[in-house]
Amino acid sequence: MRNLKNILLSFSALAIASTLSTVVIAKEWRGWNIHKPGYPNTVAMDKFAELVKQKTGGEITLKMFHSGVLGNQPDAIEQVRIGGLEIGNFNLGPMGPMAPEANVVSLPFIFKNMGHMHRALDGAAGDQISAGMEKIGIVALAWYDSGARSFYNSKKPIMKPSDVKGLKVRVMNNDLYSGMISALGGNPSPMAFSEVYQSLKTGVVDGAENNWPSYESTGHFEVAKYYSLSQHLIIPECVCINDKVYNSLSDKNKKAVKEAARESAKLQRALWEKRAISSREKVMKAGVEFNEIPNKKAFMDAMQPVHTKYLSANPNLVPLVDLIKNTK
């Protein structure tokens, strides 16, 4: 009888051990996003988190932190790069100084329009940019829209390059943007996105440049009522993951996470298109003075030295720039 009990206990222990060995401990990730609730990126990143949990069968959960509550964008990029955060929704502008291949999208007028950007990023150019990002420890899972950036300020309409002369213009922290404003005769003021409203209100800067949804959602239109449709930059955003975190996943979960990101990108692009229209309508009703720019070639010509200087310093990137420009 005692031997039978011992045998049964042994079988029970083996069964428990076997069960425990098949238990998968859920991974809990944290994700960063600068935008407020309701913004297309915020809605899409929440959908991404939902899809990650669903597609991995609960093996991975993602908690999103919106409105930049975990820090500013350059710091968050660094945190994802070193593994302090797993996920981030980043604009490629602040990432460019760290990843030269990603920086080419910050060259003024490199994209003709949104469709051109989509085709370039969804093709060979996007693959090269992704490879450049992986060199610094970041994997691009999917590309989000970020619209076309135009100038706005509190002083006057901008119709021609010389209208920027003397204006203090906030830019993201990237030498390409500072060079762009300097080429127009303006005074670039790199600063964090969260500081722009107060800086516009108090006159620390005269203007900035961004897309319609950001201009509206931040309230910048309340303190800088002149919006001039220069569309000088079309900078994509990415859903990014730390490379070590991504490479530690099973093939099944790698596929699941990438699928989740790309499905969220489809949602984000659709939401972005609608939000751009509604944001424009809202600020126009609020009394913003809007103007088209009939001669954008004058701006292209004035900003050409930015291209020349950057590619002279980075000749290895000339083929990538040509690839983007020649994307049909």
Kindly give the residue locations of the regions a language model identified.
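Bacterial N-terminal signal peptides that target proteins for export
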Residues: 1-11
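N-terminal secretory/targeting leader peptides
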Residues: 9, 26-116, 124-328
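Bacterial N-terminal signal peptides
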Residues: 10-19
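Sec/Tat signal peptide C-region and signal peptidase I cleavage site
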Residues: 19-26
